[in-house]
């Protein structure tokens, strides 16, 4: 992906907010080990920053805490929506919600305030699973090797997605997928991607 925002779809003249999952995924679907990424790819971190800056991001508490430990707070130049049942004291630029529906509403409000049409879902595994059925796109860093880990990206039916961009690198690829049909939540159906 060239760092450009994925295109949004229009309905009745209003831009619809799109949810796009962003993840670095090993060949065996591993995305984490002991609360951290089991690899260090500076190019992936730069790609993540280029992709998500200026947009709302949805994540779980553990993902937020991992980011906050490294950065000293929420991701800069993004509005973080944390999906958690815990009562957290969060700095400006981050808010906690207790349900997927509340996360969707908060992210849509933030996208409207920021003037963007795309919300990025950035982990962890449970949050990816909760949003996969409503995702319009996937922005993945696909590692060419398997890694040991305790956290995996959810299984997804590649037949429901079309690869729209690929940038092969040494040992990994940046790959963008678009859903072939509207996401289940957009159709009003309760279908999943399994």
UniProtKB/Swiss-Prot annotation:
Sequence positions that bind substrate: 44, 69, 78, 141
Stated pH dependence: Optimum pH is 6.0.
Enzyme class: oxidoreductase
Disrupted gene: phenotype observed: Thymidine auxotrophy.
Keyword Oxidoreductase set for record: yes
InterPro entries in the cross-refs: DHFR, DHFR-like_dom_sf, DHFR_CS, DHFR_dom
Record keywords, A-Z: NADP, One-carbon metabolism, Oxidoreductase
Molecular-function GO term, any one: NADP binding
Catalytic activity: (6S)-5,6,7,8-tetrahydrofolate + NADP(+) = 7,8-dihydrofolate + NADPH + H(+)
Domain of life where this protein originates: Archaea
Domain DHFR, first and last residues per copy: 18-194
Pathway(s) where this gene product acts: Cofactor biosynthesis; tetrahydrofolate biosynthesis; 5,6,7,8-tetrahydrofolate from 7,8-dihydrofolate: step 1/1
EC number: 1.5.1.3
A Pfam family reported for this protein in Swiss-Prot or TrEMBL: DHFR_1
Matches recorded under CDD domains: DHFR (cd00209)
This protein's GO CC annotations: cytosol
Region entry Disordered, spans: 173-194
UniProt family annotation: Belongs to the dihydrofolate reductase family.
Role, per record: Key enzyme in folate metabolism. Catalyzes an essential reaction for de novo glycine and purine synthesis, and for DNA precursor synthesis.
PANTHER family linked to this entry: DIHYDROFOLATE REDUCTASE (PTHR48069:SF3)
UniProt name for this protein: Dihydrofolate reductase HdrB
Organism annotation: Haloferax volcanii (Halobacterium volcanii)
Gene this chain is encoded by: hdrB
